């Protein structure tokens, strides 16, 4: 599951795991998804993708994005465009925001069964945050993504609607809360939490220390 790299760390050491808590409805998860993978590859670390219901976590903490200072929200789009330009990412602010993401998140757990989790997540992020396509909020919008990766509509729907997959997403969200995960993206290395898309220098330092 995730990246399994052999680059910098071809040593007789146990592979480091990076837990990546994400929600496709999180703008910063989009950036973190693209920025984390090269670092993981460089250090031979494995990324463990952990979907969780960010909206539920926000409600648990009584946080409402729209209630942030208007000046901050006004600057948000400009700041995101700066990030996209800096890292040469084809990011676009979607017209429809926020969206429901529970089916999309459950879909990643379905695709994990087929060894296609990371490829599916990449399609989710590109569809919504690059193509301005909010159809991923519905099952009908997810089916073409699964089909492009070779999973039949029947298999995808059957698993997505299963009690097991639904309970798995609920459990992962509860695990996130119990582990003090309060937002997305959150990366965890050896129990140490790194929150946000601007923490990769610290993540690199952590991995560098482990490689010594």
Residues covered by each model-derived region:
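C-terminal cap of thioredoxin/glutaredoxin-like
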Residues: 11-19, 24-45, 123-212
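Eukaryotic N-terminal low-complexity, Ser/Thr- and Lys/Arg-rich leader segments
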Residues: 1-11
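Structural alpha/beta surface segment adjacent to cysteine/selenocysteine redox centers
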Residues: 24, 30-131
């Amino acid at each position: 599951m995730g990246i399994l790299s052999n680059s910098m760390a071809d040593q007789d050491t146990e592979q480091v795991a990076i837990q990546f808590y994400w929600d496709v409805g999180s703008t910063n998860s989009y950036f973190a998804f693209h920025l984390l993978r090269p670092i993981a590859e460089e250090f031979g670390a494995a990324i463990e993708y952990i979907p969780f219901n960010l909206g539920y976590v926000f409600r648990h903490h009584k946080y409402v994005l729209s209630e942030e200072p208007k000046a901050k929200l006004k600057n948000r789009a400009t700041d995101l465009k700066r990030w996209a330009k800096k890292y040469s990412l084809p990011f676009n602010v979607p017209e429809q925001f926020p969206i429901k993401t529970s089916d999309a998140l459950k879909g990643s757990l379905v695709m994990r069964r087929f060894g296609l989790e990371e490829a599916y997540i990449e399609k989710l992020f590109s569809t919504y945050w690059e193509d301005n396509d909010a159809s991923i909020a519905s099952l009908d919008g997810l089916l073409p993504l699964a089909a492009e990766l070779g999973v039949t509509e029947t298999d995808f729907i059957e698993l997505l609607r299963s009690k097991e997959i639904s309970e798995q997403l609920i459990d992962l969200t509860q695990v996130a809360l119990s582990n003090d995960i309060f937002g997305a993206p959150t990366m965890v290395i050896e129990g140490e939490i790194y929150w946000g898309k601007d923490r990769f220098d610290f993540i690199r330092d952590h991995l560098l220390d482990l490689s010594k």
